[in-house]
Amino acid sequence: MPDIIIEAFQKAFELIFSGNHEVFATVYRSLYVSGLGTLLACLWSIPIAIILGLYSFKGKWIIKGVFNALIGVPTVALGLLLYLLLSKSGEFGFLGLLYTVNGIAVGEALLLTPIIVSFTSSALEAADVQLRDLAKTLGASSLRTNLTIMRETVWSLALAITAAFNRGFGELGIAMIVGVNIFQETRVLTTSIAVFTNLGQFDIAMAYGIILMIIVIAVTLVVNLIEKIKRDEIPEKHSVRDWILVMWR
């Protein structure tokens, strides 16, 4: 087992630094699908989260409970539902999204919606308790109070979006069922891992897995670093040691 892991790391760096066109095309395709899916999800998830997080109405907790439950929806079940809807005989077959990267992105947008809604609405509610009374004491209007709460939770939103992107980036079921893993068309990192594993080429499969993990970790670290910079946790005159200490906290 250790030999396989070592060979996988060697293969991963070979694939990265060899300039292999298919590897970079697969990585780009994965980033495109996850990025577009996350962007689409944000378009409707953020307004829903604001309504759930800042306003009270009947049935609110039922709706929140549904979104919380949908975080754990099996991706293969969602992929199957999308396949039926996007097929030629389905209600949305006229869109021509089946077997395309855009179709996968739409599926991922639906998958990521509960994550963004649940995380963001919870952050807004937590901030609401702390800030609303203070804002009213200072004479702020309801609109200004809500804007203040949203401003205070912007980094919670950023982390929710990052978590959603990472979830989509590592998703397999929708990509496999809706995109069917067409070579140079809909093949992404996760489906590549599945294919090479089935072929018994474990070193290449693990290499793709390592590349996937490197990208996910890098995206998360960059977002965390930007958050710390914006919060002035990194001094103006900083050294490499300062950066390491800040990232370690």
Each predicted region: which residue ranges?
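Periplasmic/extracellular loop-to-transmembrane helix junction in inner-membrane transport proteins
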Residues: 1-38, 55-57, 149, 198-201
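Interhelical loop and adjacent transmembrane-helix boundary motif
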Residues: 18, 178-225
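Alpha-helical transmembrane segments of multi-pass membrane proteins
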Residues: 29-37, 67-70, 143, 147-159, ...
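Membrane-interfacial helix termini and adjacent extracytoplasmic/periplasmic loops
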Residues: 2-14, 18-21, 78-109, 178-182
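Cytoplasmic-entry segments and transmembrane alpha-helices of multi-pass inner-membrane transporters
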Residues: 48-82, 238-249
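Transmembrane alpha-helices
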Residues: 119-120, 142-174, 228
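Transmembrane-helix boundary motif in ABC transporter permease subunits
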Residues: 36-67, 142, 149, 222-225
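C-terminal transmembrane helix and the adjacent membrane-cytosol boundary/short C-terminal tail
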Residues: 114, 121-131, 136, 144-148, ...
